Amino acid sequence: MYPQHEKAIQNLIEKFKNDLEVLAVILGGSIAKGLERPDSDVDAIVVVTPERYERQRDERRITECVFEGCDYPGGYFDLKYYTKEYLEAAADHGSEPTQYAYMHARCLFTRDP
């Protein structure tokens, strides 16, 4: 992992750690798989409460690109918001491509035991 990714990940944790509707933040994508380039984006899954997910869905924000806090050339956060129940179902019953998407994923922060 490049230093700019480490810094961006710390910024991402800071962004969500005090939000009680965020249960966990999980690193995915090329960085989690060890295939990153210096300009790779930071892919993250933000695990939220069902109520937060419904609001994000209603606002059409279950995925979003965020540039704030990811300040290297070409860098941004590619965020996907899911519930814990969705991720459990994906792990148990998801297609191979869905399960592969989470392979090597790494929990960055959790408040869920």
Where are these regions (language model features)?
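Ligand-binding pocket scaffold of soluble enzyme catalytic domains
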Residues: L27
